[in-house]
UniProtKB/Swiss-Prot annotation:
SMART domains: CYCLIN, Cyclin_C. Coiled coil: none annotated. It comes from the Eukaryota. Belongs to the cyclin family. Cyclin D subfamily. It holds the Pfam family Cyclin_C. This is Cyclin-D. One of its GO terms (biological process) is cell division. Keywords: Cell cycle, Cell division, Cyclin.
Length: 374
């Protein structure tokens, strides 16, 4: 399968290759689809914002209408308020317990696989985030044999795609099976998907940090405000915005693999990711007035998260001095899913996600129930 990738992330971006954002036809399809979509899906779609990305010798340039359009700003403010209200109502309904979760030993592999598929198929960051959330919820309360973990993740991703993407982006069964080298039959996938939905209680409205990030970036002028103290002066603000967006994408890809962050409010995670990016770039203050207002947070609330995220970043860089070499496959709205390349492993570039499995194909059935295939 052909996929565009970057092999370096450096200050000059000279080797960057970034796929173009969805064109006008895609936008028209998305808007026309709203009329037929369930109400729960419309909320997720409203939080998205299209933009344009293209390759430059020095920068990853983009257009974010909300930065200068009062109407778009008002829309994003409404979206952010709605998301925060939903968070107040739903946060705490699921608590991740790493000691009780049955998949912790394999979670990083499953998360990396989900990120890689979403990057290769150009799915949005919310799709990846929701798929990971579904996987955690199912595997936290259900004993699943190791041989079925990959199948569970596959079905969680399929459900997330149906929930977050437009109908035209939902993969066919043939495509779905190709993600795992056709190791699972259509019948076993359908049965597992039903089992996953039952385990989730058909409650698919999961709110994740990715839902907040785009609105917060729009409401904070791309994370860099007019009153910010930046090292090189106002003339470099656009450059700082682009650097900040890059760092946000990479840092968030590390955060989704950290189980210690799973029980934090999604809005605070999103705010902390942006604040951490500001600290990393030397932008002061850490938490701008715009970010405080957008996320309804105080610096005191997110400082522990910022300190933790900076530690995550430092540890990742220490483990791999070639952290510049980041596997990047596509852009989604104004975020990009980043898949860090494992140290000493070329499996991502050589084989592709279609051949990456956690274990062998399940010899039995979903949740180890003895169902006979037709």
């Amino acid at each position: 399968m052909n996929r565009s990738r970057t092999s370096s992330f450096s200050t000059d971006r000279s080797a960057s290759t970034v796929a173009l954002a969805p064109d006008g036809d895609y936008e028209r399809e998305r808007v026309s689809a709203l009329a037929s979509w369930p109400e729960y899906a419309v909320d997720a779609l409203r939080s998205e914002q299209d933009f344009i990305v293209h390759q430059s010798a020095a920068l990853w340039t983009h257009r974010t209408p909300a930065l200068h359009d009062p109407d778009s700003q008002e829309t994003q403010l409404d979206v952010a308020k709605g998301l925060l209200a939903r968070e107040r109502e739903t946060h705490g309904s699921f608590v991740f317990d790493a000691r009780a979760a049955h998949h912790c030993a394999f979670r990083s592999q499953l998360v990396e696989w989900i990120l890689d598929v979403c990057a290769g198929e150009r799915f949005g960051p919310t799709t990846a985030d929701v798929a990971i959330a579904y996987t955690d919820r199912v595997l936290s309360k259900t004993v699943v044999p190791k041989t079925s973990l990959h199948l569970v993740a596959l079905c969680c991703l399929h459900i997330a795609v149906k929930y977050e993407e437009i109908e035209e982006r939902v993969p066919t069964m043939s495509k779905l099976r190709s993600w795992t080298s056709n190791m699972y039959s259509p019948e076993i996938i359908r049965k597992m998907e039903l089992a996953v939905l039952i385990e989730l209680g058909w409650d698919l409205g999961v709110l994740t940090p990715a839902h907040f990030l785009e609105s917060f970036l729009a409401l904070t002028n791309g994370g860099i405000s007019d009153g910010d103290d930046i090292e090189h002066g106002d003339a470099y603000k656009e450059r700082y915005r682009e650097e900040l967006r890059y760092f946000v994408c990479q840092l968030y890809s590390l955060c989704v693999q950290d189980t210690s962050l799973l029980n934090q409010p999604p809005s605070q995670i999103a705010s902390a990711v942006i604040a951490t990016a500001r600290v990393h770039l030397g932008v002061k203050p850490m938490c701008s007035p715009e970010l405080r207002a957008a996320g309804n947070v105080t610096p005191q609330q997110i400082y522990p998260l910022v300190a933790h995220m900076l530690k995550l970043w430092d540890e990742a860089c220490a483990e791999d001095e070639a952290m510049d070499e980041v596997e990047t496959s596509a852009e989604f709205n104004s975020l990009t899913i980043q898949v860090p390349k494992p140290i000493g492993h070329d499996i991502v570039s050589k084989m592709g996600y279609e051949h990456r499995v956690t274990e062998n194909a399940s010899p039995t059935c979903p949740f180890d129930m003895q169902w006979d295939e037709e």
